[in-house]
Design a protein with these regions (language model features):
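Conserved, function-defining micro-sites of small-solute handling proteins
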Residues: 1-140
Length: 140
């Protein structure tokens, strides 16, 4: 989609910031709004969609680490602790922020845990299930 937008074969598109950031910085496309709850640290002058008249609008991309359901609790705890430690490292946070991604932050200390991710994941599933149901979206 971005190549079509840069080539002006389409007039509007939506993509995530890391994918579009270089095109924005080079002036090849213009960012109109961000879909998160707050402005992006790498695009602070670009207002949120909610700020532009659609209150409550929020749609973001996120990544998570998942394991098979039968994975022993001790392994999940160890993986969670290691991932949380990495997510709090200044170098990691700086590196992903540099290409427009936002670091994890599901717990009060700015980290994450298997439990906090589980809460987040269940909320996302419920939220998007409701959107699909209300919009009567069907698989074709």
């Amino acid at each position: 989609m971005l190549t079509e937008l840069v080539a002006e074969r389409i007039e509007l598109g939506m993509d995530n910031i890391p994918s579009a950031l270089n095109f924005i910085r080079e002036g090849k496309i213009r960012a109109i709004g961000v879909t998160g709850a707050r402005r992006s640290a790498v695009l602070p002058d670009v207002p949120t969609v909610a700020e532009q008249g659609m209150p409550g609008f929020e749609a973001t991309a996120w990544f998570g680490v998942l394991a098979p359901a039968a994975t022993p609790a001790a392994i999940i705890a160890r993986l969670g602790a290691e991932l949380d430690a990495i997510g709090k490292e200044a170098e990691f946070r700086s590196r992903i922020a540099g290409f427009g991604a936002e670091p994890p932050g599901l717990t009060p200390d700015g980290g994450s845990s298997p439990e906090s991710f589980g809460v987040f994941l269940r909320a996302e599933i419920a939220r998007w299930t409701d959107v699909v149901r209300r919009a009567d979206i069907r698989v074709e």
